[in-house]
């Protein structure tokens, strides 16, 4: 199961970069919301152990578990539909006692593993109609289950991930061109429909988020509140930032203008407290 590994071949630079990004993340989350910092530290420890274990695994044997991974995705997504813990109107987490599992997140990794095995198995017939239909059929169940949580953003992300995997797998340009010729107008038509009041394709809050993305000023006090304040926070950090855990009264974070800054908006904290230099280090 494990392979012989020479330390000289180990990518220590990559490991150091991963650790550095995790440390910055822990510091930023601790500054945003102290109560969740310990959970982030635990996640980093578990993640590093998992990374080292997987690094020494024989990947060819790991790929043999791809079907188990796919079934795990489907089963956990079904379970979260019936037994999931709800937050903000969406059931996305399974409470396992010692931690919460978000199946839609594990799905991203396990679907990559599954399709890597799938592409290897059918690489000689990859551009045939039968194989492409199989690939599409396998992605439909997880997409539907994720969408029903509801989780539109992850549904879109997994769809994009699937398209990237197909491209990397060697999808012919003729097929890509045909798909784009259909997909681009379809997306535009879909957006034109869901942006209308009274539409029933998506939920109202999902429509409002789309509208806020295209016209944040109109939704400055609702859906775009954190989005716009994040921009202000990043800009206020200037070159060197205001410092981690600062007590600056003019801070966007300290003024509670980013009430959920420890979530997807954590980069706003990095921008405000570490400035352009700190933000550039994270991005680069």
Regions found by a protein language model. Name each.
Residues 238-274:
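Long extracytoplasmic/lumenal interhelical loops at the membrane interface
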Residues 1, 11, 127, 203, ...:
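General structural signal for secondary-structure boundaries
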């Amino acid at each position: 199961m494990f392979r012989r590994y020479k330390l000289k071949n180990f990518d220590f630079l990559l490991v150091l970069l991963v650790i550095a990004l995790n440390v910055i993340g822990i510091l930023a989350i601790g500054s945003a919301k102290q109560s969740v910092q310990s959970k982030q530290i635990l996640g980093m420890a578990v993640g590093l152990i998992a990374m080292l274990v997987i690094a020494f695994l024989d990947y060819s044997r790991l790929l043999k578990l791809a079907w188990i991974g796919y079934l795990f995705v489907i089963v956990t997504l079904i379970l979260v539909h019936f037994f999931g813990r709800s937050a903000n109107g969406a059931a996305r987490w399974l409470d396992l006692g010692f931690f919460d599992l978000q199946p839609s997140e594990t799905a991203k990794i396990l679907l990559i593993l599954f399709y890597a095995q799938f592409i290897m198995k059918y690489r000689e017939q990859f551009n045939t109609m039968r194989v492409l239909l199989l690939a599409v059929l396998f992605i439909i169940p997880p997409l539907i289950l994720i969408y029903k949580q509801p989780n539109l953003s992850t549904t879109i992300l997994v769809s994009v991930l699937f398209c990237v995997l197909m491209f990397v797998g060697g999808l012919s340009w003729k097929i890509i061109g045909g798909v784009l010729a259909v997909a681009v107008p379809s997306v535009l038509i879909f957006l034109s429909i869901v942006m209308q009041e009274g539409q029933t394709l998506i939920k109202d809050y999902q429509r409002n988020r789309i509208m806020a993305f295209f016209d944040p000023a109109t939704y400055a006090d609702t859906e775009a509140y954190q989005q716009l304040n994040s921009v202000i926070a990043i800009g206020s950090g200037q070159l060197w930032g205001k410092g981690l855990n600062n007590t600056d009264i003019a801070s966007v974070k300290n003024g509670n203008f980013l009430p959920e800054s420890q979530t997807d908006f954590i980069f706003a904290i990095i921008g405000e407290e570490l400035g352009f230099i700190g933000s550039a280090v994270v991005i680069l």
